[in-house]
Every structure is written in structure tokens, then in C-alpha cells.
């Protein structure tokens, strides 16, 4: 017995069936036909790089009425298989993602997949990795006495290093005229921002603090408001000596000069006003300095312009 044609939803039974017929007897033979079936192979990948497979993504398989037929989870290769479904009963199925990798955006779109007779239907799902940016707003912490910037003024040309959660360098960003610097697209997670030495902006102090920012949602821009203290050059001069004297007596004054500002001083000038009708300067002593650098000392009186007293001290 050879089957030549069968029902629409069934596979033809191509196996010849041997039937033994006995005289004056009716022989009954059962011939089975399998329903035409199909299943789906799901592959979860990174949207930008299909070589990256996503494991432990959870999905549901539903019928056209929204009934959940089974639940799936991708393996280490980002793959999972549905059961085999009869085409007669389920000509199409729907796939819904319920949980994805924490670094990726959940795909909420319901996928409609048409089954094919006696085939495994391959379906690739893409997931968008979560990206965000960090926006640094750099302003003056106080009024700047050197350049006249008021408190809150944007500071240009300040550079920052951007680092990942393991403190690995990612990129360098620099503020524009508006005091704003913004990173490129960064993956979800905690990032660190630190001002780069020597690039804190003209007339401003380096901010040595490390700042953190966490990117949680796709497309978000996390703002960091960071301030810098202005450079504040300043010196303190103490004058010690006798208060009263008699005519023609030599008097001596000692000056203690200290840097009380927040920047090194390349040069500075101090003044001492004496009554010229009563006093004549006779000697200037260079003094003692506590930094091992070269010094040049100039002096000026009411009788002459600046003159070099000592060089290369």
C-alpha cells in the first residue's frame, strides 16, 4: 500500500505498507500521518555588532490570541528554540521579550513570525546597547580678581579625563567658550571625571577632585557642575625695626615677605614710603630666601628708575 495524497495539514506517509490478505477475511490497516510542524530558532545579538551574542535573555511565545504557550531563555550563544508547533493550529506565532541583558535596552516590540512547513525558522533579534553621555559645566567658584570673571562665569579650555568603572582611560574632553564639555556615547554604568593637570583654564586653580556619574537610561545626558577656584596671588609683608630715633642715627628695618596666595610668584613688588626730607637710604641687603631658584632684585627710589641690585642669587 503506497500513499499518494493526503490532507492539507499532514505530511505524506511515503513508507510502503505491506498488507497480508487472507481468504474470505477483511483486513484492517492503520496508516498514520504526521501533522506538518515547524519551530523557531531565536538568536539574540547586539544591534551594532552581530558577533556579540546575548545570553540569558528571557522571552515568551504566544498565539494570536495572546495566550502564552511557553517561556524561553537564550544560552551562551544567544540562542534558544521553541517547541515544534503544528501549522494547522499555529500558522504564526508571536515572540515577546520579557528580560534582557542589563547593559541593553529591553525590546518591547511583539515579533510576528510565520511558520514554515517542516522547517526551523531562524529569527535574529537585535538589542540596542544602552548609551548615554556626560555633560560637564565648568564655572568660577568665586570672583576672579585677575581677569574680572564673576562667580559662576563659564570657564573655557578646561580639559578632563573620562574613565570607566575600573579607572581605565576612555577619552579627553575640553570645555568650549560656554564652559561646557560633553563626552561621546558611553556605555551604561559608572564613569569617572577628573580634571587634567596643567589644563585647568587660564587664571584658575586645578580642581583635584574626582567626580562620578552613572549612566542608567539609554540616551540620557548626565550633568556635572564643577567649579574652579581662581588664582589669587597675594603677599604678606611684615616690617620690623625701631620706632623712634635721634638725628644722624642709623636705623635698620627688616622685612619678612610671605606668599599667602594660592599660586607661585614669578615676581612681585613691595613699597616702603619714607619721608625724603628726613631720611636717606644708605644700604639695601638682599636677605634670605627659602626656595632654591634664581633671584634678581631691583630697587627704585624717588631719585632714579629701577636698577638691578643683585642677579642670579
Residue ranges and their predicted role:
Residues 1-313:
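Solvent-exposed loop/turn and edge beta-strand elements of beta-rich ligand-binding domains
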Amino acid at each position: 500500500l503506497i500513499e499518494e495524497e493526503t490532507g492539507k495539514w499532514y505530511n505524506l506517509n511515503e513508507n510502503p505498507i505491506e498488507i497480508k490478505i487472507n481468504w474470505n477475511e477483511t483486513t484492517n490497516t492503520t496508516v498514520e500521518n504526521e501533522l506538518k510542524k515547524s519551530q523557531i530558532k531565536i538568536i539574540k545579538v547586539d544591534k551594532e555588532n552581530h558577533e556579540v551574542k546575548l545570553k540569558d535573555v528571557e522571552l515568551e511565545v504566544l498565539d494570536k490570541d495572546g495566550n502564552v504557550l511557553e517561556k524561553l531563555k537564550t544560552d551562551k550563544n544567544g540562542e534558544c528554540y521553541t517547541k515544534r508547533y503544528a501549522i494547522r493550529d499555529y500558522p504564526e506565532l508571536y515572540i515577546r521579550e520579557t528580560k534582557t541583558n542589563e547593559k541593553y535596552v529591553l525590546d518591547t516590540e511583539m515579533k510576528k513570525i510565520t511558520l514554515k512547513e517542516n522547517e526551523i525558522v531562524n529569527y535574529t533579534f537585535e538589542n540596542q546597547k544602552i548609551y548615554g553621555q556626560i555633560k560637564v559645566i565648568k564655572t568660577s567658584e568665586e570672583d576672579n580678581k585677575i581677569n574680572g570673571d564673576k562667580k559662576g562665569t563659564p570657564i573655557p579650555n578646561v580639559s578632563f579625563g573620562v574613565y570607566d568603572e575600573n579607572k581605565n582611560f576612555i577619552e579627553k574632553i575640553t570645555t568650549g567658550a560656554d564652559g561646557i564639555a560633553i563626552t561621546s556615547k558611553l556605555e551604561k554604568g559608572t564613569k569617572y571625571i577628573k580634571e587634567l593637570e596643567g589644563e585647568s583654564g587660564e587664571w584658575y586653580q586645578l580642581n583635584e577632585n574626582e567626580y562620578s556619574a552613572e549612566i542608567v537610561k539609554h540616551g540620557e545626558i548626565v550633568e556635572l557642575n564643577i567649579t574652579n577656584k581662581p588664582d589669587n596671588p597675594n603677599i604678606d609683608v611684615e616690617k620690623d625695626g625701631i620706632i623712634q630715633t635721634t638725628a644722624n642715627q642709623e636705623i635698620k628695618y627688616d622685612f619678612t615677605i610671605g606668599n599667602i596666595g594660592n599660586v607661585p610668584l614669578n615676581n612681585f613688588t613691595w613699597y616702603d614710603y619714607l619721608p625724603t626730607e628726613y631720611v636717606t637710604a644708605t644700604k639695601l641687603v638682599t636677605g634670605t630666601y627659602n626656595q632654591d631658584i634664581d633671584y634678581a632684585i631691583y630697587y627704585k627710589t624717588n631719585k632714579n628708575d629701577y636698577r638691578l641690585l643683585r642677579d642670579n642669587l
